[in-house]
């Protein structure tokens, strides 16, 4: 008996986009005739299963039969269907301290297909043995941003730009941006210099500026929307199935309070922003401004510190490095968080 499956044109484009752009695939089984992959995705705005969509478990069988690739797709334990495609490109991603992952891309639209069997997928196991994207991973893969490149990344302003400039997307809080490029995502953010991190940093959290400003201003009150975990993160390595608690390793954090002036509640992380004992407020806007601001402009164009009277104080600059993280780690960070993913997809 032949099993047929197909999609309308709109659904085909949406599913293809989801499988290619929002999933990092783990190889869980193979034979001479097939490969089986698994991915764990967070909530998506373009693809939503019928049941709880806060965590999307994706299982995919890849077959090559009669000159055509066949994709059999299962989502959250429910078989979604099988589809034909002209070409499949599998890109292996080896990342330090992490298991090998794959990115899949499909040549041409997903079309109807016919198979003579009902696909069976491997039993799903879930484990917390992998720590995911840790500070060690970030410091290993990140690169310092040269000044000439930083000057070409526009983060504020519109109007006429140099033809070499590119506009980045601001990610929530302070000091983090994403630049979508044809070759993939590039994350730019400020992070504590490595020597300072090793000597006095929290070795579990990624010490990004956005994380530390959120920690410094967190009021800690139950029910505070700024301080409460949105409970939508997933494990980007696909080892753990389900939503994971916040581990301080994302770039989705925002200050607790107005972006222009958030009260300091926790002194320890606040010391990374200002030397003065008079520091009262942290600001996710700069003490200086211009019609157009690039990453090459000084730190005081991006953040600020105020005293109790609202006067600007000098910002610490020597403790921060402007770094960039590229594919595939950049995509893993974005696609493990529904907040970041919604900003860029």
Swiss-Prot record:
Question: GO cellular-component terms in the record?
Answer: host cell cytoplasm; host cell nucleus; viral tegument
Stretches assigned to coiled coil: none
Any one Gene Ontology BP term: symbiont-mediated suppression of host innate immune response
Q: What is the effect of changing residue 63 to A?
A: Almost complete of cytoplasmic localization
Cite the residue spans of the region called Nuclear localization signal 2: 90-94
Ranges where the record places region Nuclear localization signal 1: 26-35
**S-S pairs:** none
Q: How is this protein organized at the quaternary level? A: Interacts with cytoplasmic envelopment protein 3 and with the capsid. Interacts with host STING1; this interaction prevents viral DNA-triggered antiviral immune response.
Q: Where in the cell is it found?
A: Virion tegument; Host cytoplasm; Host nucleus
Q: Which UniProt keywords apply?
A: Host cytoplasm, Host nucleus, Host-virus interaction, Inhibition of host innate immune response by virus, Late protein, Viral immunoevasion, Virion, Virion tegument
Query: HAMAP family attached here?
Result: HSV_CEP2
Return the protein name: Cytoplasmic envelopment protein 2
What family name appears in the similarity comment?
Belongs to the herpesviridae cytoplasmic envelopment protein 2 family.
Q: Where do the segments described as Nuclear export signal lie?
A: 55-63
User: InterPro entries given for it?
Assistant: Herpes_UL16/UL94
Result of knocking out the encoding gene: UL94 deficiency mediates HCMV-induced transcription of type I IFNs and downstream antiviral effectors leading to impaired viral replication.
- Just give the chief location class: virion
Would the keyword Transcription turn up in this protein's UniProt record? no
Role played = Plays a critical role in cytoplasmic virus egress. Participates in the final step of tegumentation and envelope acquisition within the host cytoplasm by directly interacting with the capsid. Upon virion binding to target cell, a signaling cascade is triggered to disrupt the interaction with the capsid, thereby preparing capsid uncoating. Additionally, antagonizes the viral DNA-triggered antiviral immune response by targeting host STING1 and preventing its dimerization and trafficking.
């Amino acid at each position: 008996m032949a099993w047929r499956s197909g999609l309308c044109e709109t659904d085909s484009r949406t599913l293809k986009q989801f499988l290619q752009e929002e999933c990092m695939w783990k190889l869980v089984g193979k034979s001479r005739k097939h490969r089986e992959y698994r991915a764990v995705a967070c909530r998506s705005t373009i693809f939503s299963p019928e049941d709880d969509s806060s965590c999307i478990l994706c299982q995919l069988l890849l077959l090559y039969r009669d000159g055509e690739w066949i994709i059999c797709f299962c989502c959250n334990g429910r078989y979604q269907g099988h589809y034909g495609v002209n070409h499949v490109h599998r890109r292996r991603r080896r990342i330090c301290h992490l298991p090998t992952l794959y990115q899949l891309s499909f040549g041409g639209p997903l079309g109807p297909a016919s198979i003579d069997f009902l696909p069976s997928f491997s039993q799903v196991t879930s484990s917390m043995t992998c720590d995911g994207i840790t500070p060690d991973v970030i410091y290993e893969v990140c690169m310092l941003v040269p000044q000439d490149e930083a000057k070409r990344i526009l983060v504020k302003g519109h109007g006429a730009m140099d033809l070499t400039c590119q506009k980045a997307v601001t990610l929530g809080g302070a000091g983090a941006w994403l630049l979508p490029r044809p070759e993939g995502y590039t994350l730019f953010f400020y992070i504590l210099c490595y020597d300072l991190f090793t000597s006095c940093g929290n070795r579990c959290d990624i010490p990004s500026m956005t994380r530390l400003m959120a920690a410094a201003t967190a009021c800690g009150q139950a029910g505070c929307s700024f301080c409460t975990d949105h409970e939508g993160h997933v494990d980007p390595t696909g080892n753990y199935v389900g939503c994971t608690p916040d581990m301080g390793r994302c770039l989705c954090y925002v200050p607790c309070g107005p972006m222009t002036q958030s009260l300091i509640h926790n002194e320890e992380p606040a010391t990374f922003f200002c030397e003065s004992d008079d520091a009262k407020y942290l600001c996710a806007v700069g003490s200086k401004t211009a019609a157009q601001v690039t990453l090459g402009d000084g730190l005081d164009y991006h953040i600020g510190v105020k005293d109790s009277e609202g006067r600007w104080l000098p910002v610490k600059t020597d403790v921060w490095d402007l770094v960039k993280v590229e594919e595939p780690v950049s995509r893993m960070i974005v696609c493990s968080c529904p907040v970041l993913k919604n900003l860029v997809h």
